[in-house]
């Protein structure tokens, strides 16, 4: 009997050991919580798909993916849940060359959240709206705390290191990218490919992000975002940016939003034709929509560019600016600092704004035209010898018809500004333009007039 008992005990122990071994071979990597029910999965794809219509997905450990990834969250079935990476790393996200739109770990994020996850060794390729974490954000979705540690992200249009695009309403914050980003057509951004369209009562935000990956496009290109109607603040770019309408932070800021307290140290290069517009240390081109785009930009406001710093060289084609390459019509340009020692273009260049001009009012919804508020707290250390162009200036080059630039120093509380004028003129023009200055205690109004 003792021998039989010993044999039975040995068998039980062996079975127990075998059960533990089987469990370790199929380890759970994520869990999904919906309501009061939590389910663990050995497949990240299964966990994410289980929460597409709502719920929380959490990583339980680092994950190494094998094979090709199939994007979760499509146009017909977007991802509406929350994915919390808990600081873990997903290695080997591989999406091979294809003609699909909305490509990434998650294709379309509809009001959901992706946060606190790292990606290593990514290889993500699609057609349009391509990003490592999310292809497109809609309906107020949020992406935060995502780190892309290296690899490549590529496509035709709207390609971002973290997010391909934001449409009208959404937030990307505290993300970093070190992957190379390439758009074979246009709209490549180190963090977000494009943040575009406007809707009444809705806002887009890109804040506190860092890009360290080279960004290249055949068209609009930005170190943080390419085409933007978002509020872009507190971001840093250190990498080279090459494209047309190219900026160290924003390629083209259009119709709406603000660009504040960003820093660029990456070299900015316009690779377009000789007449290509816009190369800026912070923004390549600032402008407003045309009548044909009224449906895309039904809400407009004067764009503010304040508190930004650039130290990266700027090489343009038609124009280049240490902060903004080209400004159309209206903007508020205050308290920006350029320390780049090389700013060059064929025609127009300056330490802060390379080319300010007015164009015909784009649309009835566009803000009041022909007013540029340019603060005397904008500074540039670049000398005229370090600025190369046919028409150049230490701070801003004005170019156009009946242009008024208002320099507004901060008034002291003890002595509010008085609005009387003492006319005094001087010739401060370069090239074919002259500048007439009207001095007052409120500042200086500048008007560009063509030489005769």
Locate predicted features.
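Sec-dependent signal peptide cleavage junction
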Residues: 15-28, 421-428, 448
């Amino acid at each position: 009997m003792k021998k039989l008992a010993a044999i039975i005990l040995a068998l039980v122990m062996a079975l127990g050991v075998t059960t533990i071994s089987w469990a370790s071979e199929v380890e759970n990597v994520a869990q999904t919580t919906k309501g009061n029910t939590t389910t663990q999965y050995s497949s990240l794809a299964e966990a994410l798909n289980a929460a597409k219509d709502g719920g929380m997905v959490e990583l339980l450990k680092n994950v190494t993916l094998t094979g090709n990834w199939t994007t979760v969250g499509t146009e017909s079935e977007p991802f509406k849940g929350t994915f919390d990476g808990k600081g873990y790393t997903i290695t080997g996200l591989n999406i091979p060359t294809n003609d699909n739109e909305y490509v990434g770990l998650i294709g379309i994020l509809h009001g959901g959240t992706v946060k606190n996850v790292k990606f290593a060794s990514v290889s993500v390729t699609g057609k349009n709206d391509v990003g490592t974490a999310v292809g497109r954000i809609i309906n107020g979705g949020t992406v935060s705390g995502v780190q892309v540690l290296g690899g490549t992200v590529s496509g035709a249009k709207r390609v971002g290191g973290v997010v391909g695009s934001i449409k009208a309403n959404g937030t990307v914050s505290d993300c970093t990218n070190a992957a190379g980003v390439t758009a074979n057509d246009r709209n490549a951004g180190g963090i977000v490919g494009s943040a575009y369209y406007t809707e009444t009562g809705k806002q887009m935000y890109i804040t506190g992000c860092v890009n360290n990956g080279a960004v290249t496009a055949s068209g609009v290109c930005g170190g943080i975002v390419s085409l933007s109607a978002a509020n872009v603040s507190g971001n840093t770019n250190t990498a080279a940016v090459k494209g047309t309408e190219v900026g160290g932070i924003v390629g083209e800021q259009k119709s709406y939003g603000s660009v504040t307290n960003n820093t660029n140290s990456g070299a900015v290069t316009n690779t377009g034709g000789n007449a290509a517009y816009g190369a800026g240390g912070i923004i390549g081109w600032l402008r407003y929509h045309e009548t044909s785009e009224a449906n895309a930009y039904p809400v407009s406001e004067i764009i503010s560019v304040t508190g930004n710093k650039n130290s990266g060289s700027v090489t343009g084609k038609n124009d280049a600016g240490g902060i903004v390459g080209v400004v159309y019509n209206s903007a508020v340009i205050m308290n920006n600092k350029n320390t780049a020692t090389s700013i060059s273009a064929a025609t127009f260049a300056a330490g802060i704004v390379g080319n300010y001009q007015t164009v015909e009012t784009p649309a009835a919804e566009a803000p009041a035209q022909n007013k540029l508020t340019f603060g005397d707290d904008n500074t540039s250390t670049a000398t005229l010898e370090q600025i190369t162009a046919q028409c150049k200036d230490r701070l801003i080059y004005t170019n156009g018809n009946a242009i008024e630039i208002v320099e507004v120093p901060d008034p002291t509380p003890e002595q509010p500004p008085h609005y009387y004028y003492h006319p005094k003129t001087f010739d401060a023009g370069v090239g074919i333009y002259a500048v007439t200055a009207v001095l007052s205690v409120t500042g200086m109004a500048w008007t560009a007039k063509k030489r005769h």
